[in-house]
C-alpha cells in the first residue's frame, strides 16, 4: 500500500465507545464522544480510558501490532479473516477450595494478564508480590489500573500512522522509520524467573548488595556448585535491596542478564508506574514505558498527544504544539497571536476564559478580565478599583488599606463590622 492510500485510510475511530459513561465524572458527562483530533471526550475532557469502554480487543490489536516484525511474534496470533496481529496475552485462572460448614466450595480468581511462564506457581508468586491494587484481577481496581496503563504507556498513535490526525505522506514515512527503529533497538518484554535459574544461561557475574559482583573461579580451581549457590546474593537493579531466595525476579534481555528487578520495581524511570504486561523500552541503562521512551526521542504535541514529525512546530508554556493544534482548549480557536490564559496547563482564549473560568468580583458581581488587576483573599476576589474593593458598610476604598474580611465582605474598621452584624 502506498503512502497516499495510507493517509486516506487514517481515522481516529470516533464511533468506538460512543456514549459510554465516564467513571470519573459520573453523571456530569453525557457519555463518551471522541473529540475530532484530541484524544479526549468532547463532553467531559477525560480520556477514553476513564470511560466504561470495552477495549480488550482493541488493546490486543494494538499490542499485537507493536510486536509485529519483532522477536516477540510468539506473543501474537494473526486472525485468518484479515491477517491482523492479535496479542496472545496470558490469562490465568486460579481455583482455591474454600472450606464451609457442610461442604467445600471453589473460589475462582481470574487474572486478565499473567506472565507467560509454564510454572503457574511462579506466576502466582509474581502476582502476590505486586501491590494488591495493581493486581489485574478481572473486575477489580487492578484490572482498571492495567487498562489505564495500556492506554497511557502504549498509545496507539505512537506506533500506527492511521491513528494520527492528518499526517502528510512524508510524516507517515518518517513515523514508520521511527517505529521500526525503536522495535529493533529498544522494545522488550520482561522475563520472570528465579535468579538461580539464570546462572547457567546468563553471565557469571551477578549483582550483590553493595555493588560488588561475584567473580568466576580461577583456572584449574575446583568449583563447589552448592556453596556457590548458597553464597550468591542478588540485588534489585532499582531499589538495590537483596532478593529473597525463592522469590521470582524480572529480567530484561536488552539490559543484560546481570540486572534483575523485584516484580513491583519493574517500573518506568519517568512515571514510576508498573510497566504494563512487562513491556519495556531500554535506553541509557534505564527502563521506560512506551510513552516516555518516545518522549525522550521526539517532541509530543500537547494538543493532540501525538509525536511531532513535522519540521515546523511551536513551543509555548514549556510545551510543544503542532502549529494547527495550538488552540483554545474550550472552543478550538487558533491562538497564534491571540491573548490566552493557562487553565490547568491548558491554553484558553480570552472570551472562553471570561465565560467559563474567570472569578467573579465580590463587589460588582461581574467576571474579572484576565488582564485586569484584582485583589484576592482566600476564595474571594475583587476588581482592584475604587468602584469594587470597598468597605461593605461605608463604601470606603480599601486599596492599600488594612481591612477585615467576613464571609465575602470586607470592612475598614471594627465599627463598620458591628454595624453590619
From Swiss-Prot:
GO cellular component: cytoplasm; focal adhesion
Annotated PET domain residues: 92-199
Matching InterPro entries: LIM1_Testin, LIM2_Testin, LIM3_Testin, PET_domain, PET_testin, Pk/Esn/Tes, Znf_LIM
Name this polypeptide is given: Testin
Record GO terms (molecular function): zinc ion binding
Described purpose of this protein according to its UniProt entry: Scaffold protein that may play a role in cell adhesion, cell spreading and in the reorganization of the actin cytoskeleton. Plays a role in the regulation of cell proliferation. May act as a tumor suppressor.
UniProt subcellular location: Cytoplasm; Cell junction, Focal adhesion
Subunit structure: Interacts via LIM domain 1 with ZYX. Interacts (via LIM domain 3) with ENAH and VASP. Interacts with ALKBH4, talin, actin, alpha-actinin, GRIP1 and PXN. Interacts (via LIM domain 2) with ACTL7A (via N-terminus). Heterodimer with ACTL7A; the heterodimer interacts with ENAH to form a heterotrimer.
Domain annotation LIM zinc-binding: ranges: 234-297, 299-359, 362-421
Domain notes per entry: The N-terminal and the C-terminal halves of the protein can associate with each other, thereby hindering interactions with ZYX.
Gene Ontology BP annotations: negative regulation of cell population proliferation
CDD domains tied to this protein: LIM1_Testin, LIM2_Testin, LIM3_Testin, PET_testin
Major subcellular site: cytoplasm
Start and end residues of each stretch annotated as Disordered: 133-164
Family in the record: Belongs to the prickle / espinas / testin family.
Compositionally biased region (Basic and acidic residues): 155-164
Originating species: Aotus nancymaae
Alphabetical keyword list: Cell junction, Cytoplasm, LIM domain, Metal-binding, Repeat, Zinc
SUPFAM superfamilies in the record: Glucocorticoid receptor-like (DNA-binding domain)
